[in-house]
A protein has these predicted regions:
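Basic, Lys/Arg-enriched alpha-helical interface segments
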Residues: 1-64, 72-80, 86-89
């Protein structure tokens, strides 16, 4: 299933910070495109559900300490946050 992508304002800020830090944004874009297209991520990305304050969210790893937090609602995928563990939690 193909999803319509939406981005929170916080995600846009996080995205700019990742660029400033010199992260390989192509990796993030590839994973986001795969998620938008409804593809299953490879095991290395450790895609999983979150709990607690993030009960309806999912998280995947772009790299070992670079995460992407997102939500899926029917036909929409909302990219909420990206950054390191210490940035997000």
């Amino acid at each position: 299933m193909k999803y319509i992508a939406k981005y929170t304002n916080q995600f846009r800020k996080d995205f700019k910070l990742c660029i400033k830090r010199g992260y390989n944004m192509q990796l993030l874009k590839e994973i986001m495109l795969a998620l938008e297209n409804g593809e299953e991520l490879i095991e290395k990305n450790r895609d999983h559900c979150l709990f607690g304050n993030y009960i309806s969210y999912r998280e995947c790893h772009i790299q070992s300490d670079w995460l992407l937090i997102y939500q899926i609602h029917s036909d929409v995928i909302v990219f909420d946050r990206t950054g390191t563990h210490s940035d997000l939690f």
